[in-house]
A protein has these predicted regions:
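Lipid deacylating catalytic domains
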Residues: 1-380
Length: 380
């Protein structure tokens, strides 16, 4: 009798998996499920619903709830794949002695975990979180969340919205003349295009983002230091990471975006978040093992510098355990949100980075993840 594997996809802080057709892991879920089936593996792949910006402990409790609801019927092995902050949730889940929920016991499930894979996760934090701590940053975080959901639902943001937002980003560093009413107007314009039912769901999601932002200070380089001090690897669990590095914004990347005004303006948004993320303090960069360093050098031709990032998380902050893949991609490319509308179902992108990441690289990356998950499974 074959052993049933339980694979959990854990979202980051854009974790809108509960909004109907707006699927955070849509393409990754379908590909991984089909890939495991092709291998003859009996596996259930589950996308986890978590509070988007709640604390890592609360998000890990959400993960525990999902696992208890779907993996209690047997004692099969459990595998955790976390994108962005979801990678930190996965690490806390298996940390010996972790206490995340008064209602559910963690240890019976944690001891069944065989692998933890983190994708573009901020193991050493990200300076972008420091920016999001401010009032302007908090409003911007909600708007970026809405942008992501809008693009996945409708394909593109209205050009008028992108133009106004791009103008705002050009002045964001000094914030002179910034008025909350402009962001409110952008919210209202975008929400008006959703159906009444979907608008209510999106509004609730955004309200949750604004109500509980406990996660944000935990993701700063200083905040993550405390997390790492209290979170430990579990013996017997295999840890692997997928690392992403995007091209820094430049004249070349602007030219690569072409003449499309939409691509040019959304590239402005990418340039802004990249500029915030690349401010990683040298003292906060983690030391890597020789094997990790060799993997990065082999993939990128040289060791990524301290400013290298995927637009959201510094590249060297993403390394944890075995480096399974190091790819040239932005933060959302890694989960299938890149520009390839001809594919069915289409891949849709709003963070135009000019990374060049497309379906072949996406499939190769997720196949590597599948290889790692089933590394100790006997061939069929």
């Amino acid at each position: 009798m074959s052993v049933k594997h339980h694979v959990y996809l854990v979202p980051g802080f854009f974790g809108f998996t509960n909004l109907g057709e707006l699927l955070y892991f849509g393409h990754a879920y379908e590909f991984l499920k089909q890939d495991l089936a092709r291998r003859g593996i009996d596996a259930e792949v589950v996308t986890v619903v978590s509070h988007p910006t709640a604390s890592i402990r609360q998000r890990t409790a959400d993960l525990l709830k999902a696992v208890s609801e779907t993996a209690s019927g047997d004692d099969g092995p459990i595998h955790l794949v976390g994108h962005s902050t979801g990678g930190l949730d996965a690490r806390l889940f298996v940390s010996p002695g972790a206490q995340v929920s008064e209602a559910l016991e963690l240890e019976p499930f944690a001891r069944r975990v065989r692998t933890v894979v983190t994708v573009s996760a901020p193991h050493a934090g990200t300076p972008l979180a420091t920016f999001f701590l401010g009032l302007f940053g908090q409003q911007l975080l909600k708007l970026l969340s809405l942008f992501t959901m809008y693009v996945l639902r409708f394909g593109r943001l209205p050009l008028s919205v992108v133009f106004r937002f791009g103008h705002l980003m050009a002045r964001a560093d000094d914030q002179l003349g910034w008025k909350a009413t402009l962001l409110d107007q952008l919210f209202d314009q975008l929400l008006g295009d959703f159906s009444s039912e979907r608008r209510d769901a999106v509004t609730k999601f955004l309200w949750d983002v604004g109500r509980d932002t406990s996660l944000i200070p935990q993701l700063t380089p200083e905040g993550i230091d405390l997390f790492n001090g209290g979170t430990h690897d579990r013996p017997g669990v295999r840890y692997g990471s997928v690392v992403t590095q995007a091209r820094p914004p430049s004249l070349r990347t602007r030219l690569a975006a072409g003449l499309d005004p939409y691509a040019q303006l959304t590239h402005t948004i990418y340039a802004f978040v990249y500029g915030q993320t690349q401010r990683m303090p040298l003292t906060q960069l983690p030391l890597h093992t020789p094997a990790q360093t060799a993997a990065l050098v082999q993939a990128y031709g040289a060791m990524p510098g301290p400013t290298a990032c995927d637009g959201i998380v510094p590249t060297r902050s993403q390394v944890y355990g075995r480096v399974l893949a190091a790819v040239r991609a932005d933060h959302l490319d890694a989960i299938g949100h890149f520009d390839q509308p001809a594919h069915q179902p289409p891949h849709v992108d709003w963070l135009i980075s000019g990374s060049g990441f497309r379906r072949p690289q996406f499939e190769a990356m997720w196949k590597t993840i599948g290889d790692f998950l089933m590394e100790e499974e006997p061939p069929r």
